Amino acid sequence: MGKGLLGKRVAIGGSRKTEEISTIIEKQGGIPVIRPLQGTVYLAEKQVEPDLRTFAEEKADWVIFTTGIGLETLVDMAEKIGLKDEFLQAIRQAKAACRGYKTLSALKKLGITPEASDEDGTTRGLIRSLEPHDFSGKTVMVQLHGEKAPALMAFLEEKGASVLPILPYQHIPPEEETVERLCRELMNDEVDAVCFTTAIQVRSLFDFAKGRGYINEVKKVFEERAIAAAVGKVTAEALREEGITRLLAPEIERMGAMIVELAKYYEEKE
């Protein structure tokens, strides 16, 4: 194996498989710096129940699902509060749209064929498929997963929709101390690259930087010095939504492939 990351300090934003990813970085000559940005995603049954009741009773013109597990969880939650039939009826009466093949599969299991779905697993792809439809004055229920999907929400609101977001899984941000430390390391040129393995990690870093007033400095670092690496399309899309265009993402959506891509970038740069 080459040494494309020789002497490079590579921050890891994930909290799973950190030993495995650290080993790959070290084999490439790099120095892994573990800075967990994931936080905790938890099942928010109590918080979601009022929204679920509203949707089951008042219905919607459109329903948009962004994850398969989110759809399945909402069905389970509706069953627990005695509204499964009403919930399924509300979905079946509405026009449906979805992001990702797992979500499409979960809808088909319920006998629902969506009117719109992405071609590439991204929110941008989902928005493209929704473009031809009229949302003016329409009520749209959107199932989200731990984060707010700002581009999708802005698109629907611009189209004149009334949006009811439902988050069966909600997010507790990571430890402030960890994110503060990474922001400082970026601004002080102490980190050469940051590896993001989920969109939530991207939001955690940039939301924190916005809150602390570091956002312009952090963006400048990614534009000029440190490189952002994304494990796949959805994570890369979250970076672009934050205004980061100088980034790497492997064709094969694997952590190992992301590190190899990063090493290749530095080898070619040298």
UniProtKB/Swiss-Prot annotation:
Disulphide linkage map: none
Sample GO molecular function, one term: uroporphyrinogen-III synthase activity
UniProt superkingdom: Bacteria
Pfam (any one): HEM4
One of the GO BP terms on file: uroporphyrinogen III biosynthetic process
Protein name listed in UniProt: Uncharacterized protein YjjA
Gene: yjjA
